[in-house]
Every structure is written in C-alpha cells, then in structure tokens.
Amino acid sequence: MALDHAQPGQVIDLEPLGAALRASLSHAILKTRTLELMRVVLRAGEALPPHHIHGEMTLLCIEGAAEIDLGASTCQLRARQLLLLPARVQYAVRALQDTSLLLTIRLPAGRGARHCVVDDPKFATASASMKVA
C-alpha cells in the first residue's frame, strides 16, 4: 500500500497537535528522490532506539521536549528548537514530555527507501512505520 505523501506546491500544516497529540501517530509527510520529511510523535517516556541515517538530517521540535542521545553526548530539544545531525551519526530519541518532531532527511543518491540502519530489529524503516520502545 502506497503512503499518501504531500505533492509539489501543496501547503503542509505543521502546527502543534496539542490535545490531539496523544491519539496521533508518526507518519511520513513527503518523500522525493533526495528528501524525506516525517512527523515523529512520541508520548512521554517513549523512545526511538539507537540508529543512524545515511544522509544528513535535522530534527525540529514542534512541541514538547526530547532528549537526543548522540553516544558521546546528549542534548535536549524543546519546542521551536532545531538540531542538525551529520550523515551516519548514531542517535536515539527519548520523549521527556508528549512530543512531536519534524524529521528531515537528505537522502544520498542511490539509497532510495533503504536509508535507515537500526540496531534494534523491532524498529522498521521510518517510511513504513515509526516503532517506539
């Protein structure tokens, strides 16, 4: 089943989900040959396991707060804060509060849908579904 992605010229609403966050799911927003955007929704205490992306990426905290574990260091993202991660850097995300994040990935040429390498076999490629621990 194909995912319903945004089309060129389509306006995308990225407002905070507010009270609807707890019932919302992570989902792909758009995907092109070189770019992928996903809205990642995590409830307080939920986490994405350690993994890395082959391309550069950004995480924008739309609402809530999350701890980003970069192995040697950690940082916190709060609403309206952005973090740039270079390609192939392992990271994990843990929600400190109910949180939604905009994940933007620059896909390297030739990688297509197989951009995500995950150390936890329960975690599927983000395009298909975002599984949390």
Model-derived regions, located:
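Short beta-strand His + acidic residue motifs that chelate non-heme Fe in jelly-roll/DSBH
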Residues: 48-50, 68-69, 85, 90-96
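A short, N-terminal "cap"/entry segment at the start of jelly-roll beta-barrel domains
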Residues: 1-34, 117-133
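Short, conserved beta-strand element in jelly-roll/cupin
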Residues: 41-43, 52-67
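Structural motif
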Residues: 65-67, 74, 90, 100
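Conserved short histidine dyad/triad with adjacent acidic residue
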Residues: 23, 36-53
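Short acidic-glycine-tyrosine-enriched beta hairpin
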Residues: 72-87
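A cytosolic small-molecule/anion-sensing beta-strand core signal
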Residues: 62-63, 78-79, 97
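Ligand-binding loop in jelly-roll beta-barrel domains
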Residues: 87-111
